[in-house]
Amino acid sequence: MAKVVGIDLGTTNSCVAVMEGGKPTVIANAEGFRTTPSVVAFAKNQDRLVGQIAKRQAVMNPENTFYSVKRFIGRRPDEVTNELTEVAYKVDTSGNAVKLDSSNAGKQFAPEEISAQVLRKLAEDASKYLGETVTQAVITVPAYFNDSQRQATKDAGKIAGLEVLRIINEPTAAALAYGLDKKSNERILVFDLGGGTFDVSVLEVGDGVFEVLATSGDTHLGGDDFDKKIVDFLAGEFQKNEGIDLRKDKQALQRLTEAAEKAKIELSSATQTEINLPFITATQDGPKHLDLTLTRAKFEELASDLIDRCRIPVEQAIKDAKLALSEIDEIVLVGGSTRIPAVQAIVKQMTGKEPNQSVNPDEVVAIGAAIQGGVLAGEVKDILLLDVTPLSLGVETLGGVMTKLIPRNTTIPTKKSETFSTAADGQTNVEIHVLQGEREMASDNKSLGTFRLDGIPPAPRGVPQIEVIFDIDANGILNVTAKDKGSGKEQSISITGASTLSDNEVDRMVKDAEANAAADKERRERIDLKNQADTLVYQSEKQLSELGDKISADEKSKVEGFIQELKDALAAEDYDKIKSIIEQLQQALYAAGSSVYQQASAEASANAQAGPSSSSSSSSGDDDVIDAEFSESK
């Protein structure tokens, strides 16, 4: 079988590896480096440059040099507002999709197209190394990437001419590389702080089994954000001294960005660094130069809020894994940004353990992807990888409630189904609104897409049985199917190009869910109460109609009175009154029902007949039907 390579498609740098002789090997690129900058540029002659050569010319060609593209992939225009100010190239958000504008190429590119150029270079370099054409790959993504971002990454692979056999999470890949030869069971925490994203995963590793217990993250926290802190500091100091904002000059901004990255790297080993940028700009008085000293202490002060943000996903992952930090055996650092001393210090402070630095943080993810590639190719035996989905998935039901089908941190691949019904008599279609998030209300979660199931035979509400099936594959990509059990009509949607989560929304969902738990619970209880009251009104009117003259006029009048009171309370949204009248109406119905049975029993005795004379017909479906309904799509 052909070789399957493992690719870490990073925000700042990318890496490719392959299994050779049962061991993973990192493949150096054509320039001799083991990592490749995730940078693509278009020169004036329209030549396409990829990797180190593209990065080197960025200062002279800032508007046609594309970097940190991973922050745009799989996202909608309204979700990249913050990113627009952090790059020197033009990002077009006027249409339905994000486009990257290149004046030299004379066209616009989708982020997937730019990422595909990086993937293509890695595949070509691997092909030269192996002496055979590479056509299959395992590509890694941040654990907190959503469905659209995962699919967009897969599409980038396809554009690059690769068959993407699997999309796997970066911290999981790192755990594979770390734990390949581990025989004894260990609980490990992977702390993955890369160029653009931050992931934390808790895994149980040992004897070939890699089980993810929980994952958390922040999709807008990485090395780029640390660089921006330095850029803003340098630009602020220069503006204070010279009255000029360098951030408005794209060429100067590119020079500042490169200087900031270099300073950040130097401060990992030195306590201070000199930043010299001669001829950074010019005025009528002549050229201006930037010359500053940046200490590690000042850098840590500038980035203190970013470092503090590292705490939340760690705490969330530990909580979701139902473990204490003392139960974690090893802390594995992944991603170049974990070289920052302050980051290592906060990890040690939180966990009370020295982080394990036995793996190369720049290469370990690609190595893990190569191991997974070896598993899929049959080269690596006796490895079982059990990953999870990072966010809950569900559908919107009556009252705007999110009904969860798959809770977050569920092992994938997985398939779950639930049966729902209609909300109105004669309803012939339902709209399935697929959601992702942790809040109780649909409007507070992220919409992944909607689709409609038509052709439901007209029937009283609550009678049709509509089975909704959620199927997440090993790539973490979701497919949803809705099927009417009566007619056999079926409709499905693959959540691929749907609306996706913005950079702040994913982690905000979990935080908001906890912060707003009480309010969410109250709103959910109110909607449940309204649904209960609606159903009771419907059933009561139906029962009165069926009983006819079997109950006395007084009993009938009493029930009708409570029904009207309940309708009035519903209209006024008086929840205390709704609760009170529900109880009174139920008691009145019980009394009416009892009198019917007593009357029937008396008649039976008079006729000397034994046995029941009536039977209950209250069952309306099988036990799997959830007490939640769809509103009819107009």
UniProtKB/Swiss-Prot annotation:
Low complexity compositional bias, start-end: 601-620
CDD domains xref list: ASKHA_NBD_HSP70_DnaK-like
Keyword flag Cell division: no
Record-linked PROSITE patterns: HSP70_1 (PS00297), HSP70_2 (PS00329), HSP70_3 (PS01036)
UniProt entry keywords in alphabetical sequence: ATP-binding, Chaperone, Nucleotide-binding, Phosphoprotein, Stress response
Region of interest (Disordered), ranges: 601-634
Residue list for modification Phosphothreonine: 197
GO molecular-function term, one example from the UniProt record: ATP binding
Pfam families found in the cross-reference section: HSP70 (PF00012)
Function: Acts as a chaperone.
UniProt xrefs under PANTHER family: HEAT SHOCK PROTEIN 70KDA
Family recorded in the similarity comment: Belongs to the heat shock protein 70 family.
Official protein name in the record: Chaperone protein dnaK2
Organism field: Synechococcus elongatus (strain ATCC 33912 / PCC 7942 / FACHB-805) (Anacystis nidulans R2)
